[in-house]
Design a protein with these regions (language model features):
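PLD/PLD-like phosphodiesterase catalytic module centered on the HKD motif
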Residues: 1-225
Length: 225
């Protein structure tokens, strides 16, 4: 067993060592952020399989409409967690968001599967890395974001995560598998997740982003023209 305070000792650094080319990554968490993918891009691109369960109903109560959205302006804070949470604002301000979203969507089509809890029943939040010879469980993994990986600062006083090994880790993997394979409690939402992330790079052309950026920089001077 090991512990991570996510300040001087962070979960992300340990995951880069544990996730291998033949690893299977299984996560049960409240939300997924493209910036968590970015933090572990090399490892997730090379892993064998990635499974994610939204622990509360997501993409099932009602479809998110695909109406046109404005490019991100920090003070509006309108993006969903897939595009980054409120504590990943520094990352979202960078014009890399579009590129990250495209890379993430491409990876999802090749490696990832997403399912959601469709019930009102609660579920533990955790991440399991399964390798041929061992397995590691990180808990709690409340959300799969840059904050929960220790890459960014959130609004919690503490952000402690514990890593368990076998045989305890095997129990968490069995729990995940039992939920994953239960059609009465779980629904596949992989295409919904990919479609929503894809809108980031489909809706805003490079030229549009460029001119919106210029507008945000110089708008206060327009009245003087």
């Amino acid at each position: 067993m090991d512990t991570f305070n996510n300040t001087t000792k962070v979960v992300k650094d340990d995951l880069t060592k544990k996730i291998q080319s033949d690893s299977k990554v299984s996560i049960a968490a409240a939300c997924f952020s493209i910036y968590a993918y970015q933090a572990l891009k090399d490892e997730l691109e090379n892993c064998d399989e990635f499974r994610f369960i939204f622990t509360s109903p997501t993409f099932v109560a009602e479809k998110t409409p695909k109406e046109r959205r404005e490019f991100y302006i920090p003070r509006l804070n309108r993006e969903k967690s897939l595009y980054g949470t409120e504590f990943e604002v520094r990352l979202r301000n960078e014009l890399k968001q579009k590129a990250v979203a495209k890379e993430c969507a491409d990876w999802m089509r090749r490696k990832a599967s997403f399912r959601t809890n469709t019930t009102r029943e609660g579920m533990n939040n955790f991440l399991v890395v399964e390798n041929p010879e061992d397995a590691y469980t990180y808990m709690p993994m409340n959300s799969f974001t840059a904050v929960d990986l220790g890459c960014e600062r959130g609004n919690n006083i503490s952000n402690m995560v514990t890593r368990l090994e076998n045989p305890a880790s095997k129990e968490f993997l069995n729990l995940f598998d039992s939920v994953w394979n239960n059609p009465d409690k779980i629904q596949d939402v992989t295409n919904d997740v990919i479609d929503m992330i894809s809108t980031v790079y489909q809706e805003n052309s490079p030229e549009f982003i460029y001119f919106i950026t210029l507008y945000n920089i110089f708008s206060e001077f327009l009245d003087d023209i």
